[in-house]
Amino acid sequence: MKPLIQVQGVSQRFSTASGEFLALQNVSFDIYEGETISLIGHSGCGKSTLLNLIAGIALPTEGGLLCDNREIAGPGPERAVVFQNHSLLPWLTCFDNVALAVDQVFRRSMSKGERKEWIEHNLERVQMGHALHKRPGEISGGMKQRVGIARALAMKPKVLLLDEPFGALDALTRAHLQDAVMQIQQSLNTTIVMITHDVDEAVLLSDRVLMMTNGPAATVGEILDVNLPRPRNRVQLADDSRYHHLRQQILHFLYEKQPKAA
């Protein structure tokens, strides 16, 4: 199977007041169509830097990245990003926030009526059809993230990039959105790359977990295959010995092999 995303010998340096800082060193891995990949590691290990490189928001100092066998040289609609901060424009309705992305990508290929139907379809997909005409200040944090996901999906991306999208949410809202992401991935076969600090979230959602070494000069230390059948049910997994074994492997890497500095 041909990889959809290829990260090839990537290093990333930054100039700082105290000199050059090597954030990532010689990072290489492939991501295949329909996979859900989690990036996990301690703060400062370069997870967001790596996601920004895949998004094309930044370019690597060394090495290269490919999406569908084309060089990633900047942002593109085939790689949609959802940040922890929903990034919705507060003066626009939920519908209009999604419309900004849809109009930019599909203005020439869809009629105005088709774009309207597509926007509504994607908001319905994340259970936000009831809030089309509400502004961000009128809805909850979890609902804002749903609109952000709808906006990303409406671009018809090949890859959905999630930068700790549930980190600021309460536990129940977080669980509902995790379930929504699993349902979307299953129905659309979307390729997902997600940053998380949550070990349980990584095991629940992922096909593979990329565990990052501590920075500076961080790299992928180990890759864990999550061979749990889908669809996954969090209640059933709580009693599954395989789930607990996978969880323990991640914890062992993070706190035994890569202990966080005090």
UniProtKB/Swiss-Prot annotation:
PROSITE patterns: ABC_TRANSPORTER_1, ABC_TRANSPORTER_2. Residues 5-239 form the ABC transporter domain. One of its GO terms (biological process) is nitrate assimilation. GO terms for cellular component: plasma membrane. ATP binds at G41, H42, S43, G44, C45, G46, K47, S48. The keyword Zinc does not apply. Keywords: ATP-binding, Cell membrane, Membrane, Nitrate assimilation, Nucleotide-binding, Transport. GO terms for molecular function: ATP binding; ATP hydrolysis activity; nitrate transmembrane transporter activity. It is found in: Cell membrane. It is a peripheral membrane protein. CDD domains: ABC_NrtD_SsuB_transporters (cd03293). Coiled coil: none annotated. NCBIfam families: ntrCD (TIGR01184). Belongs to the ABC transporter superfamily. Probably part of a high-affinity binding-protein-dependent transport system for nitrate. Probably responsible for energy coupling to the transport system. This is Nitrate transport protein NasD. It comes from Klebsiella oxytoca.
